[in-house]
Amino acid sequence: MTIRDIAKAAGVSPATVSLVLNNKSGVSEERRQVIQRLLTQNGYEKRCHDKSSLNILFVKYVQYGTIVEHNGDFINRVLDGLQDEADKLRINLTMRNLNSHHFDEIMDCFKTGGYHGSIILGTELDDAFAQKLEHSPIPTVVLDNMVENYELDSVVMDNRGCAFSGVRYLIECGHRKIGFVKSKYDISNFHQRYEGYRSALEKHDIPFEEKYVFEVEPTMHGAYHDMLNALSKGRELPTSFFAGNDSMGAGVVKALKQYSYRVPEQISMIGIDDLPFCSISDPMLTTMAIPKETMGRMAVRRMYEKVLGDSQECIKKLLYPHLVERESVAKL
């Protein structure tokens, strides 16, 4: 049984069950005993929330592998923020990997592993798994995915706003033929960035042209080869691209240069992430920088609030990126 099921059986709200599970006040003794009996019968362990001994499980969820496993720089910076905030709050942080085939295993771990809460790296999180997470027996915060349609706390970049701002910058630089480097994998973040791109064009009365959307693997190597294939077919090119991430942008730039296109003189490029290679690539890549460490710190802080019962509302936190101007965008 999930927390919601137990709440229904006991005739109380899920929040009341959470109070008992987390050994908090605010529940009558008679009702507490009923709820505790149901919790025990279903394998839930009462947790003692001494502020000096909170145990949080960080789960790196992998659905495709291509996106998460090829973005180690991004993830490592997020982890730096997670660990830094956990150390400040005296939280024990345990890390595990998870794919869609091991959901039952991780739910058992939530129930019996002695964890007070979990933080899920949800970059590749799909709807099916998000729906299951809504019934998590412990407080859960999703990182790097808005999980818009689900009652789950989240900390994520404003993907739509980020893409909108990046495309607006290209427009301010004089570009009207603006393409989009789109991931073949339609995860939430990439989809929202595409929406932001479309929205910016519409806002500035620039017609959307499907021919300027190039689908590639969301890795530098994959984007390079997919763009080479597109160029070999003689596809018409815009004067600039907004890429769904830096890796795709860099891969496309490499392919363009191999076909003797000059970047940014002939074709400009802007990405998202501000990964380390952006400052040493040729040309150095203009990008929208994500506050990665801040994302990690905010996820831990939000989990801390939930576990201690300071805030039980579902809160979704958006972080706004900022533009880092380098060498890959030309003014027309």
Where are these regions (language model features)?
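N-terminal helix-turn-helix DNA-binding module of bacterial transcription factors
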Residues: 1-53
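Short acidic/polar active-site loop segments enriched in Thr and Asp
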Residues: 13, 45, 116, 176-177, ...
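Alpha-helical structural signal in soluble globular domains
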Residues: 38, 81-85, 132, 192-204, ...
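Alpha-helical recognition/docking segments in bacterial nutrient-uptake
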Residues: 55-168, 172, 231-232, 236, ...
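Short hydrophobic segments within beta-strands
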Residues: 59-61, 121, 143, 180-181, ...
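Hinge/beta->alpha junction and helix N-cap segments in small-molecule ligand-binding domains
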Residues: 61-76, 95-103, 155-165, 181-228, ...
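Flexible loop/turn connectors
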Residues: 226-332
